[in-house]
């Protein structure tokens, strides 16, 4: 068998199916919108993402899975039009509110999911998908991003396949299968005739700034699902004896993948 015979889109879907991962509902993300919006534009992750973007010749940007506007709002003052797309209405509301606070009149939002009809989603010079590509059908998602871009696409996808440090999983006695990581995307893009650039962004994971055990446990539960009583007890015992560095865990690593609309 040669690499040309491998359907990486199918491999991705098969891998994702083994995780038995349940997609977060729009209402689940709605509940987090206010908290995420309060720190969206002040993160090192956002700074590093934007620093890797080339806006030369661009006047418009489509931010797919925009959340509260972490990337789109960070560059909105350099563009004529920014469109935020998300399936969480509260996230879109947070983006609009922040845009108004920043006195930005060039920001608009679209309430859409990856699986919805995108026929009315505008094509833009730049398309970004920041930490929003763990989807059911990544091959179709990449085709959508490519089709909607005039100039360039920028996205980040998880490295290693775990949203929560495996060491924490071991503490509670639960083994969570890894989700498909970025290597699938590179191979699918190669099959599409696209030769992307690859870089990495590392930053503190979301457990690092938990204010106390309850906050820490809530964040673990968000990622891994509701904790059973015995899991919670093990986590508490570990937390009480762990150093601040151990509680912080390993950093999150994201593959920063970008390409020009005209294949290299």
Regions found by a protein language model. Name each.
Residues 1-56, 58-67:
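Conserved class I S-adenosyl-L-methionine
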Residues 68-115:
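Class I SAM-dependent methyltransferase SAM/SAH-binding core
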Residues 125-139:
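A short SAM/SAH-binding and catalytic strip from SAM-dependent methyltransferases
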Residues 150-160:
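Conserved beta-strand signature within the Rossmann-like core of class I S-adenosyl-L-methionine
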Residues 158-176:
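Short, glycine-/aromatic-enriched active-site segment of Class I SAM-dependent methyltransferases
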Residues 178-193:
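Short alpha-helix
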Residues 197-264:
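Conserved Class I S-adenosyl-L-methionine
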């Amino acid at each position: 068998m040669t690499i040309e015979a491998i359907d990486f889109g199918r491999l991705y879907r098969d891998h994702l199916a083994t995780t038995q991962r349940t997609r977060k509902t729009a209402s689940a993300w709605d509940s987090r919108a206010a908290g995420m919006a309060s720190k969206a534009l002040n993160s090192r992750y956002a700074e590093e993402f934007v620093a890797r973007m080339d806006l030369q010749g661009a006047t418009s940007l489509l931010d797919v899975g925009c959340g509260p506007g972490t990337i789109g709002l960070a560059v909105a003052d350099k563009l004529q039009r920014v469109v935020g797309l998300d399936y969480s209405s509260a996230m879109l509301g947070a983006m609009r509110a922040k845009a108004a606070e920043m006195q930005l009149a060039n920001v608009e939002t679209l309430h859409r999911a990856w699986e919805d009809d995108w026929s009315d989603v505008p094509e833009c010079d730049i398309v970004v998908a920041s930490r929003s590509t763990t989807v059911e059908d990544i091959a179709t998602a990449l085709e959508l991003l490519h089709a909607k871009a005039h100039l360039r696409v920028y996205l980040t996808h998880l490295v290693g396949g775990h949203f929560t440090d495996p060491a924490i999983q071991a503490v509670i006695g639960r083994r969570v299968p890894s989700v498909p990581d970025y290597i699938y995307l590179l191979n699918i893009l190669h099959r599409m005739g696209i030769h992307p650039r690859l870089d990495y962004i590392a930053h503190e994971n979301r457990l690092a700034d938990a204010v106390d055990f309850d906050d820490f446990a809530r964040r673990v539960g968000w990622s891994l699902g509701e904790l059973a009583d015995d899991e919670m007890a093990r986590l508490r015992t570990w937390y009480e004896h762990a150093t601040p560095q151990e509680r912080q865990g390993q950093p999150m690593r994201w593959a920063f993948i970008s390409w020009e609309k005209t294949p290299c």
